[in-house]
Amino acid sequence: MTKELLLAVCLLPAVFMLHGFEEIVLMQPWLANNSSRIQARFPRLAKHINHAAARSTSAFALAVAEEFILICLVTALSVWYSSYGVWVAVLCAFILHLLLHIGQSLVLKSYIPALATSVLLLPYCVWAVLLLVRWAQFKIWQICLLCILGIVLVAVNLLLALKAADWFDRQLDKYKAGHK
């Protein structure tokens, strides 16, 4: 593995967290100002929007932290064992995540939380994929299969992380109620 590819691999946790910080800091205020507009335009999403808007910033940060820990673990194990398949799957899912944010912004015709880092981090993602194809001897078809795996793994993990966030919010509410 080249130093350049190793750098790209090791940067993923930092890149993810940069994106996560934008989401953590801006999601709740943005939802407070925009949820009614989105619900009016997309009534089928009203239940999901209300649920996301009710989630505390602390609970959302917990979900992002769980994802960050997993990405750090995948990155460390990939480097340790010089086996990058799962890391490629996670990178592909992250790229899709960024593209979805850009798509959401285009559909809403406005800024959404995480748009800035989605645009700013795409060059890193393209660079990492090009390095993988060039130096790690991944074929495009292998990367495509790993992308499917990554999407499934990340989707399942996201559901679990958000369930944990909701549980955390309930515990936080109990704690607050007991300390009044």
PLM regions and their residue ranges:
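N-terminal signal-anchor transmembrane alpha helix
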Residues: 2-28
